[in-house]
Amino acid sequence: MLAHLFSGIAKWAQDSSGALTILPDCATELPEGILNDDGTVTYTYTLKDGLTWSNGDPLKASDFVFAWNRAASAALGADYGYMFEVIKGYEDVANGVEGAKLAVEAPDDKTLVVTLANTISYWNELLAFPTYYPVHEATVASEAWATDPSTYVCNGPYTMSGWEHGSIITLTKNDSFHNAAEVTMPTIRCHLSDDSNNMLANFKNGTWLLIDDVPTNEIAALKTEYPDEFVVAGQIGTYYVCWNINERILPEDSTLEGVEAETAQAEIRRAISLLFDRNYIVNEIAQGGQVPASSFVAMGMTNPDGTQFYKTAHSTNDAFDGYYDVREEAFESNVDKALEVLAKYYK
């Protein structure tokens, strides 16, 4: 929803082939950074002409300076404040050092200069993330600004025109948006629900046009019933089971100490992990297109050279990628190995 209400330096958009890519939004272009002698990297952005807030105030480069320092500050304690750690000066700002500021400046109303602590390959991706959106300084001085459409000042393709708390948020096209000609839907009604059964019922009866969750037990049928509409979207993340066990998991009568004890406990933890049938979990329980995890770092996270991290994280001559062999045909062998380890320590 924030992407409808705010506009940042950059944005995600579809290119001519339909693939998602990052394009300039409030900025005229996304230039290459300049490498400084001390290893820092400086980027200079020029804002487009005529940018305004929804209340008519001009949008200035200083709005980004304020918003980024606010989001990174210890005083705000924002969940995503850490995303500014790539910018020089972040540690002092995050730790609440008096007078500390991020290395972000606005020499004039249309120029934004930011210096990163070092080279960052994903800098443009950060610029397109909602945490990097600007906020209207005078508006956010009131903590309640974001809970009422009458005080919700934004700069995106839509404004908030209605909010029935716990029910519906209504967005209306922002005619003063810098790219308003490309905004084709005059109104978006966002129904608030955390009930997947309710979501699906409203989609089926035509009340809602888009939903982002369905009951797990309906997935198989929906793939057949709505072959074009039902889409499983990728998401980078790892779900895991956390065992509530003591730090020392060796039997009480074990005589192992020091490095030997640590090595043994690592073997035991690995053995427990091998007992999980990951394929059964994703295919029979989750059913949402998840894939078995062979490392804690999810598929989709890449090394600087573009290779998948999980494939190189545990480089061995084994026939599988990652730390565990998660192929279906390997499960029986995994269990045998796990039981062998557990039998060695628990007799």
Where are these regions (language model features)?
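Gly/Pro-rich hinge or "lid" segments in bacterial periplasmic/extracellular proteins
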Residues: Q14, L116-T187, N197-N198, N205
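Surface-exposed binding/hinge segments that line
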Residues: T44-T46, D63-V65, L76-E137
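Append "and occasionally in soluble cytosolic enzymes with long acidic Gly/Pro-rich linkers
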Residues: T263-K347
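Aromatic- and charge-enriched surface segment that lines or borders ligand/interaction sites
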Residues: T28-Y80, V113, N202, V259-T263, ...
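A local structural motif
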Residues: A19, Y43, V114, A180-H191
